[in-house]
Amino acid sequence: MPDLLLQKGDLQLLFDRLSGDGFRLVGPTVSQEAIVYDEIASVGDLPRGWTDVQAPGSYRLEPRSDEAFFGYVVGPHSWKKYLFPPLATLLTADRTDSGWAMHAPPEPTEKYAFIGVRACELAAIKVQDRVFLEGAYVDPIYKARRDRCFIVAVNCTQAAATCFCTSMNTGPRCQAGFDLALTELSAAFIVEAGSDSGRQVCGQLPLREATPAERAAAEAARAQAVAGISKRLETEGIRDLLLTNLEHPRWADVAARCLSCANCTMVCPTCFCSSVGEVTDLKGDHVERQRQWDSCFNVDFSRMNGGVVRNDVRSRYRQWLTHKLASWIDQFGQSGCVGCGRCITWCPVAIDLTEEVAALREPGP
Amino acid sequence: MSTKPKLAVFKFASCDGCQLTLLDAEDELLDIAGALDIACFLEASSRVVPGPYDVALVEGSITTPHDAERIREVRRQSKYLVAIGACATAGGIQALRNWADSQEFLAAVYARPDYIETLATSTALADHVTVDFELRGCPINRGQLVEVIAALVAGRRPRTPNHGVCLDCKRRGTVCISVARGVPCLGPVTQSGCGAICPAYDRGCYGCHGPAPQANVASLAEHWVRSGAGPAQLVPLLRNFNGFTPEFRRVSDELAARLAATE
Ligand code: SF4
Ligand code: SF4
């Protein structure tokens, strides 16, 4: 299918089409002085004319000089909050005269259309698909949401100082894993369809074929993102580098700075850890089994009979980084990092994993 | 005779807010009253059944010689002693006196300071007696209090998570106000329990639930100093409801010394 052109004024028609097909629209919107992902009703909710300026430990929402709808990079939220919800009830149980009555929670009925998914985020969804859908155990909560979602990707036309998707081969160009992908120009979007449902939606929109000049303009816009990427993670031999340097002095150095606050794991679009616990009412007659996002940075996360396994920040930071960049490859056949830079921006003390890896490449004193 | 566990609530130097949390547990109050024999709870009833008690919920810090005596008596009378709130677990906001001259305060406030008998410090219950469980917070969280009572009734360990506040912000989708707005926030080093209320209302965390385990307060403070927040701003932030906990105290003392050196 050739590249198509959608006038900016017709973007709402795409939203209407998806709403008409029963999708709840989730997309970028300005809230709490950031561009977050939330339910949106119309193009009026998009962060038009806003951008983000990011650095290690710092994020600022700033006005743009133009009226771009998608003129920002990635923010504090990721799509995982919709596919792998922060809190989920796995089962409820009630005491009855004849024993416990167990109930599975109802299947979710909502289906989401994600608007504005970036290339690194498509890659992150693929990483979580591998974790939740493609192993011996399929997570029904993730599957129900994932099977039904419609993805409108957006190609980046700029990069943040924290981005390094080019090092991880995940972006900035959206290659696959979307239903539609947009590239924003000043007056229109270039639209590519990546699936049958995407092509069907295209058939119901007032699109025309893009001219060679428009296609070239889209290419140039996307090239700006590549040119804007300054951060780099050297991945050559990274698995062995990390796993053979478990006693490198840099681990103690980063442990002196790291707060073990878990923010990096919470914002990471691929981190998938959770804990499961039971919550009862006072009489113990009603029990809910709940799953919540959890993190390897929490002391109690490795508590077992006999004590805590990773009982200092050094071992917890090392666990996180070696899993993300090294043992993830053994476990899932790919890296756990897609280079989105969120853990760098949202670390309250500006710890940058690319710098930590670079330091681990230097021999210790 | 009732076989229900006998519960007593005691108060030391405090504002009563934590005991009020028990009365505030409106949805659960009838169940609590059904599951426990509330033998002594002066805020709710003047009926006092003498000890011993199975469970004592104790609010407040130790600030007078009389307190120091009385907490030992409470300990003798109670099988399971739960310290509730920042006063009981850390000395409370009144522990600010620990950095000052309490005699000077007495002279300024009372016409006859010689009528007042007080200790030089405000300290946690655990500094005086063995405490079986500490429920943190200023005030304590209602849900956590109900959890502690439910656990005691069921004979299991209370489940009160000890991770940091940031996890709760992230679970509820609050954007980090420290990263997005440069607001100094104690969330990364503070124990969860409040549900991360303050950042959701555009305020930095005050550290109401005290330091999280292995809290790296020094690194957080260093980061703020590098980002331009001075010790004059950071010392009062750390010297708050839980200011006298060793983790917060050590760093506020260091910052205060730095401030003194520059003055
Ligand atoms: S690396 Fe940063 S965000 Fe992650 S746990 Fe350490 S201090 Fe928190
Ligand atoms: S480790 Fe950091 S840069 Fe990599 S995917 Fe996770 S949040 Fe993004």
Regions found by a protein language model. Give the residues of each.
Chain A
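A generic structural-conservation signal
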Residues: 27, 267-268, 346
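Ferredoxin-type iron-sulfur electron-transfer modules in oxidoreductases and energy-metabolism complexes
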Residues: 235-256, 274-365
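Residue-level detector of anion-binding/catalytic polar loops
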Residues: 24, 264, 343
